[in-house]
C-alpha cells in the first residue's frame, strides 16, 4: 500500500526521460502521479498487488500524455479496482482521492471493479472525516465478492465493467461514470398529488418572500435608505 505525494510537480523528470520504468509512457514533467505508479508496477512481482492512493485527477487527466499512459495500463489488464473515497480524509488536505488496486495476478481477467464510496464515513471533527469499521468492512466484502465472481452491481455504489466498457468511456476511470445513481425508494404519493402539494408549498414560499421583501424595504426606509 502506498500514499505518494499528490500531484508532485518537481520530481526530476528531466533526468529520467529514458528510464526503463516508463513502459507505458513518459510521465509529464509537471505531475509525478504516473511516475509513482509506473515505478511500482516496474517492481511488481508476477503475483504481486499494489494499493495506491492518488488524487482524483489521475482518473481522468489527459494532460501531458497521462490519458495515454492510463489507457495502456488498463489495456495491460493491470487495473483490478478503483475506489472513489470521500473528501476530508486527510488532516493535511481536503482534496478527494481514490484508491487504485493493480495486480499482475487478477482473478477476474478483463474486468475492473468500480466502487463509489464518496458518501461513506463520519465527520469526527468539523474538518476531518473517517471511514468507520462498517464502511471498511463493506468495501472489503465487496472486493472479496468481486474476486470470487459473486458480486452483483449495486446502483450508486459498485459496478463491474469490462475493458471494452472502459474503452467506450475513453479510459476515464471515475467510478461515478460506471456505478450510476442509487435507486430512490417510491414514497407511494401519486405524481399529480405530489405536484399539487409542491406547487402549493412553492406559492407559499413566494408569498413569504414578498412579505419579507416589503418588511426589509420598510425598515430601510425608516432609517433614511428607502428602496423604490
Spell out what each predicted region is.
Residues 1-228:
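A conserved structural/catalytic subdomain of Rossmann-like adenosyl-cofactor enzymes
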Amino acid at each position: 500500500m502506498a500514499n505518494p505525494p499528490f500531484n508532485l510537480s518537481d520530481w526530476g523528470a528531466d533526468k529520467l526521460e529514458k528510464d526503463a520504468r516508463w513502459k507505458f509512457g513518459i510521465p509529464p514533467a509537471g505531475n509525478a502521479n504516473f511516475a509513482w505508479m509506473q515505478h511500482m508496477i516496474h517492481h511488481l512481482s508476477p503475483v504481486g498487488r499494489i494499493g495506491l492512493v492518488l488524487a482524483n485527477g489521475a482518473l481522468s487527466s489527459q494532460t501531458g500524455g497521462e490519458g495515454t499512459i492510463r489507457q495502456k495500463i488498463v489495456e495491460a489488464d493491470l487495473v483490478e479496482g478503483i475506489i472513489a473515497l470521500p473528501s476530508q480524509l486527510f488532516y493535511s488536505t481536503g482534496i478527494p482521492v481514490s484508491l487504485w488496486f493493480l495486480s499482475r495476478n487478477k482473478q477476474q481477467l478483463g474486468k475492473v471493479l468500480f466502487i463509489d464510496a464518496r458518501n461513506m464515513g463520519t465527520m469526527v471533527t468539523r474538518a476531518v472525516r473517517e471511514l468507520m469499521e462498517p464502511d471498511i468492512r463493506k468495501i472489503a466484502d465487496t472486493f472479496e465478492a468481486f474476486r470470487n465472481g459473486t458480486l452483483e452491481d449495486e446502483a450508486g455504489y459498485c459496478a463491474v465493467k469490462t475493458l471494452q466498457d472502459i474503452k467506450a468511456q475513453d479510459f476515464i476511470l471515475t467510478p461515478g461514470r460506471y456505478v450510476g445513481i442509487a435507486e430512490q425508494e417510491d414514497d407511494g404519493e401519486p405524481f399529480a398529488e405530489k405536484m399539487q402539494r409542491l406547487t402549493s408549498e412553492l406559492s407559499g414560499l413566494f408569498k413569504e418572500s414578498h412579505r419579507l421583501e416589503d418588511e426589509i424595504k420598510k425598515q430601510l426606509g425608516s432609517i433614511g435608505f428607502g428602496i423604490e
